[in-house]
Amino acid sequence: MNLDLREIPAVYINLQQDVERKNSIVDVLDECGFENIIRVDGEYTPDRPLAGCSYSHYKALNEVDPPFIIFEDDCKAKNFRTIIDIPDDSDAVYLGISSWGRMNSHSGPCVQYEDLNGGLLRIYNMLSAHSVLYLDE
């Protein structure tokens, strides 16, 4: 199935006080050509930042109907392809992962993946993502 990512709502997670990050991610999404950009208020948990991040993703999943793409507010677009081909039975597609997750390919607890073709990866274990396309509930 071919998808034009620009036609899918771009949902970004952002803490209300992080105005600079908000401006940065909106600029990134505008430059990529997204037509519908939606902000979800991130959860601030200073003692448990990973829990706050996870809960923020959970909030986004419950506030917006699929299909949509979730972006974290610190992501950057590198080699952004506007049209992608994905399997028809996909429920979710990781569009980008952080450098922290990628540095441990097949060797650590962060991320394990297999390169299927031309940058399309099958993810086996993921703890760090910067954007995820959700196609179904």
Residue ranges and their predicted role:
Residues 1-71, 75-137:
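An acidic/histidine-cluster motif and surrounding catalytic segment
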